[in-house]
Amino acid sequence: MPARVDTEAEKRLAAEAAARLVEDGMTVGLGTGSTVARLLPPLAERELEIRCVATSPRTESAALDLGIPVEPFDRLERLDIAIDGADQVALDGWLVKGGGGAHTREKIVAAATGRFVVIVDSGKAVERIAAPVPLELQPFGLRATLRELGDVRLRDAAPSPDGGVIADYVGEVGDPMELAARLALVPGVVEHGLFPPVLVSEVLVGRGNEVERLEI
């Protein structure tokens, strides 16, 4: 019988390793999700002089409760590092993000930082990206957008932090670059949850009792 994977412990290991990458004086992007929630306590314990931007109200509230300063993104000219989780991390460096419905903000932050670090448990590491792929959609003309997209399922979830409708593409992924381009061309799609390897600096994978570091 295979050994039971302690997902909680793996998330915590990856999160603690990422917290150690943050240094005094840095500007830091904080992602959204269960693994990022485990990043905040060890980051707060270090009592660093940092300035942070959060990708969701949930992360902002949790960070402020722990004494981590959070500012509006537009006050920061650049980000030294951003740390976020992922729903899937493929061997070729593609990510799927957006299980928490904040992938539009997460992608903006990932593109604006000099170092985007992804933290996951071993169950999120996959050979190839597969559905579902999260989508944020404009509420206006939603039915027309859904018809154009085809294989999409609306999610029973709260709107995105910016009021978008959250859905999932559930069709064949195939080449993620081709799918990303096709989804982006559909009017009404605010953003999709496919993150290309060019955005990713490194991935920290909690695996058993260790952290595996993958450079993309």
Region locations from a protein language model:
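N-terminal glycine-/serine-/threonine-rich phosphate-binding loop
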Residues: 1-82
